[in-house]
Design a protein with these regions (language model features):
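Hydrophobic, aromatic-enriched alpha-helical segments typical of multi-pass transmembrane helices
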Residues: 1-219
Length: 219
């Protein structure tokens, strides 16, 4: 049983590397920018199309591998009722990951293409206009993604999982918050831009690793 769980967590970590790698591919570069949207930078303007293609392609195995690990976590919930709620929240929350990824990649691909084909002067207003028009997608998709993690925190803090209650404070959202604070201390650089864009994947690597290590040591 534990070997299957470890395999599932390793799938999750691999999924994070796929998804997070795509996040880095689509952002890593010079941070200089002249518009209102800080990630429409000189670096993203010069990123070749193959990097955006690869970033999108990696998202598909990434989300499948994420799903394997996230669904496996439900086996740690004690009661069937809570297990089913977690299951459906998880299924509901996985779809927006791809939608949000696609939203950013489409804008960045257009921005890069316009800068490379003689439309550089129009690239910023066009892409900022597109972002402004569809920016409502961001809170909607994030609002769909987060409930499963909030519910997991509730389950752990109330003792409804096999983990001790203190492990609620290793929740992926708290890890994300800690890493977000860390980015505020980083100098402005391509590394910071890539790290910030991949923050959720990096947080989930740590989360999966913590659970895998704890379960291995508690056997």
């Amino acid at each position: 049983m534990q070997s299957k769980q470890n395999a599932a967590f390793l799938c999750g970590i691999l999924g994070c590397l796929c998804y997070g790698g795509g996040d880095w591919l689509m952002m890593y570069g010079s941070t200089a920018h002249s518009g209102a949207v800080s990630w429409l930078t000189e670096g993203t303007a010069s990123i070749p199309g193959w990097r955006y293609d690869l970033a999108m392609a990696l998202a598909f195995p990434g989300i499948i591998l994420y799903g394997i690990a996230l669904f496996s976590v439900q086996s740690y919930i004690k009661n069937e009722k809570e297990r089913k709620i977690y299951h459906y929240l998880n299924a509901f929350g996985l779809t927006p990951w791809i939608a949000l990824h696609l939203f950013y990649i489409m804008i960045l691909t257009l921005f890069s293409w316009m800068n490379g084909t003689g439309y550089a002067a129009q690239a910023i207003p066009v892409c900022e206009g597109l972002y402004s028009q569809l920016s409502w997608l961001i809170p909607v998709t994030e609002g769909m993604m987060l409930p499963v993690f909030i519910y997991w925190f509730y389950l752990q803090i109330s003792g409804k999982t096999i983990f001790p209650k203190w492990m609620a404070f290793t929740n992926v959202l708290l890890i994300f918050g800690a890493l977000k604070c860390l980015t505020l201390l980083m100098p402005d650089s391509a590394f910071r831009l890539g790290f910030t864009n991949g923050l959720m994947s990096e947080s989930m690597v740590i989360w999966f690793a913590i659970m895998m290590i704890y379960r291995s040591k508690s056997k």
